């Protein structure tokens, strides 16, 4: 889901508001693109390039939205735990703990919760509990200096503090290669000294973040990739292709890739 840029006050209906915040709840992870380049021809809504400020602006809106959700859960749990049901006592205590954490401006994913508390929170579909990848969007001519780029360092430090992932890519380059044929694209990337495109880098990071892998099936007329959770066993992987394959699964055979080729 491509969510348009959020502004201050989005959690209270400013800009594109709550409608777009609700779309994020349906996602498995959030890819947060952060501007890390200077260009006088591209105006910034706040008048300057400051990755830390931009990240804080978005994160606070998500935190505010989550505070509203947790507050409603807390009110409901407080009313129901009077019945003596321990379920609602635990829910109220978890909501109180998490609300205090959110109130300090921190995302839910950094709150130290027990397994039981996390199981409760998982059912609330909080925005700031979702795994995040920060994408530092750099200029085309900054690719050689990613590791020494101060703006990228800022994003990486924030990602580290939040237990999030971070990749640096140039959206400008991605736009240029999007319309190229495969051979032309490979040659272009080679000239830039890049092993793989930013999109491929981002996809790999997303797979890692969500604990996913792919396996391939190949035939005379089709080659296809199937996405499964890391650690999925062979019968369940076969079931992704067709349920009959899982029901009738007999065995998996290990073959060296060189032999397969």
Question: Where do the model's predicted regions map?
Answer:
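Residue-level signature of catalytic and energy-coupling elements of molecular machines
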Residues: 2, 20, 31, 70, ...
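Active-site-proximal flexible loops/turns
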Residues: 9, 42, 73, 144, ...
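Substrate-engagement module of ASCE P-loop NTPases
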Residues: 26, 61, 66, 157-162
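Switch II of P-loop NTPase G domains
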Residues: 1-32, 36-59, 113-124, 148-151
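A ubiquitous short alpha-helical element
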Residues: 58-62, 171
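C-terminal-of-GTPase-core extension/linker across diverse P-loop GTPases
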Residues: 76-261
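Conserved phosphoryl-transfer catalytic core
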Residues: 67-74
């Amino acid at each position: 889901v491509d969510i348009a840029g959020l502004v201050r006050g989005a959690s209270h209906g400013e800009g594109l508001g709550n409608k777009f915040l609700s779309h994020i709840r349906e996602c498995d992870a959030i890819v947060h693109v952060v501007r890390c380049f200077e260009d006088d021809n591209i105006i910034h809504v706040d008048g300057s390039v400051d990755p830390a400020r931009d990240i804080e602006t978005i994160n606070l809106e998500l935190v505010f939205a989550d505070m509203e959700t947790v507050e409603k859960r807390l009110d409901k749990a407080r009313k129901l735990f009077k019945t003596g049901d321990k379920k609602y006592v635990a829910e109220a205590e978890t909501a109180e703990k998490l609300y205090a954490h959110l109130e300090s401006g921190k995302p839910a994913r950094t709150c130290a919760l027990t397994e039981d508390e996390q199981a409760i929170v998982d059912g609330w579909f909080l925005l700031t509990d979702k795994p995040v990848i920060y994408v530092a969007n750099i200029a085309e001519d900054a690719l050689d200096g990613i590791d020494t780029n101060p703006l990228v360092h800022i994003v990486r430090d924030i990602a580290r503090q939040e237990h999030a992932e971070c990749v640096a890519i140039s959206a400008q380059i991605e736009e240029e290669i999007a319309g190229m044929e495969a051979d032309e694209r490979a040659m272009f990337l080679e000239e830039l000294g890049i092993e793989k495109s930013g999109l491929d880098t981002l996809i790999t990071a997303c797979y890692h973040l969500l604990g996913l892998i792919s396996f391939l099936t190949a035939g005379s007329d089709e080659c296809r990739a199937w996405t499964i959770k890391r650690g999925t066993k062979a019968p369940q992987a076969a079931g992704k292709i067709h349920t009959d394959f899982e029901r009738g699964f007999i065995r998996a055979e290990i073959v060296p890739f060189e032999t397969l080729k």
